[in-house]
Amino acid sequence: MARCLYNSTIREFLQLSPEALLGRFVNNYHGTALTVTNEAWANEIHIMQEVLQPWKDEDGQVIFEYDIPRLGKRIDVVLLLRGLIFCLEFKVGERDMLQSNIEQVLDYALDLKNFHLLSQNRIIVPILVPTRFRTSSSEFIPSVYDDSIYNPLVTGACLLYTSPSP
């Protein structure tokens, strides 16, 4: 059984239409995808295709809906880029930064670090994306645990687009 709904290089991801990608998500999903789930995936696909455009020539991977068996949850997006692991949790339509959502994305990063062999010696940057949030944290601060996990960043979707180019 696959541990994610979609996994490809950044280049391959950018070459597919949002409709084709959504079709793959639905086909790979084990269960009935509700309309709200499909809409969230469509939003995440659109956002990530915009965000990753400047990185199209990079040797990176993008993974959607990665299973975290210990929690019985899925990380919305795992991005492997330039030796870093970015763990993104989207809250589509949300305007606010909730502490419970920050804790959720940090838990995902901790689970990757502690229970995924290939992540153990990598730097992990958790990012919470309440899509309608109007501000952004941009200070990269290592956690107090000296475990190569950074404190979660929080940004609205529109501010992900304004990240510096490679």
Language model segments and positions:
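Short, low-complexity, polybasic intrinsically disordered segments
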Residues: I127-L160
